Amino acid sequence: MSMSVAGSMTMSTLPGVGSPLRLSPVTNLERMYALDEAWNARDWDTFDAYHEASDVVVYWPGREKTPTIGGPDHRAESVRFCAAFPDNRVKHPYDVLFGDGDYTAFVTTFTGTFTAPLELPDGTVVQPTGKSFEVIFSTIARWRDGKIVEEYLKYDNATFMQQIGLS
C-alpha cells in the first residue's frame, strides 16, 4: 500500500519503529487504512481483526453517552448500518491522516444512500427514505497490540439526519 502521508512521504517509505508490544503510529496508520478498506468491501472478518473483541468501546455519532462495547456488538451494529446504507463509503485517500503513539486520526468524506430499513440498537426499525448523505467524517482511535480498543466516530449527526430525511 502506498498513500500520501506527511507531504511527499508515502506509507511504504515511512519508518516503522516499535516493539512487538507497542506498535508504531505508522503501523497503526496502515491498519486504520486497511480497516476502512475492509469497511468499504464489507469484509467483516478483516474488520473484526482490527477491533479488540472483548473490550473495544466505540462511540457512534449521536450515541456518545451509550457506546457500543465489545467487538461482536460493534460488528453487528456496523452490519446493520451497511444493510440500510449498502452503498456507503469512506473516501480514500483520506483528506487528513495522522498518528501519535497509540492514537490515529483521520478526516475524510462519508457517503451513502438510505435504501433499506435500519434497525437501531434498541430494536426500533426506521424505514428507508431513499435519500443520500455526504458528511465530513473523522475517527480517532486508540490502539493496543494492533487492535482498536477505543474509537470515536464523528460526523455532524444533525446534518446526516436532515440529508437522509429524518429531521
Model features per residue range: what roles?
Residues S2-S167:
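C-terminal and inter-domain tail/linker signature
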